[in-house]
């Protein structure tokens, strides 16, 4: 059964976290991420011309190839993240559909990163697998 974004946001982010933990490839390419530094992510989906609802925030705990937590939050300042990845709804839609890569979107300015860009680029293979696993969640979009 497909999960619909944004109305099924809670279930969707939990499903993505499960996909990451089921992925041997993510376990391998994410090895070392978040070790001796805060590798947790805040993913921020902003309204745009396609979606005029509320901002969506997902917290994803990542450490050494494991997703330690994955949930939607209404309080982005209430979670301890080391990196934030921000973009508009339509851009996230393209990412989840694999029409845009995470690193390509970042380099083109379609996504913004708060955090250590150099470290993120060192783990670009993990970003690719994370995007593939997001695409593996059966997703429909309301807008």
Where are these regions (language model features)?
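Feature captures hydrophobic
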Residues: 1-143
């Amino acid at each position: 059964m497909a999960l619909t974004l944004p109305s099924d946001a809670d279930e969707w982010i939990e499903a993505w976290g499960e996909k990451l933990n089921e992925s041997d490839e993510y376990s391998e390419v994410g090895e070392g991420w978040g070790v001796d530094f805060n590798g947790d992510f805040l993913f921020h989906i902003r309204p745009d011309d396609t979606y005029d609802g509320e901002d969506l925030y997902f917290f994803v705990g990542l450490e050494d190839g494991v997703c330690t937590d994955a949930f939607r939050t209404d309080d982005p300042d209430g979670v301890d993240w080391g990196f934030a990845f921000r973009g508009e709804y339509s851009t996230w839609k393209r990412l989840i559909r694999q029409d845009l890569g995470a690193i390509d979107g970042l380099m083109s300015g379609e996504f913004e990163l708060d955090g250590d860009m150099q470290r993120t680029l060192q783990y670009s293979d993990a970003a690719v697998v994370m995007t593939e696993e997001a695409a593996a969640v059966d997703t429909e979009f309301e807008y």
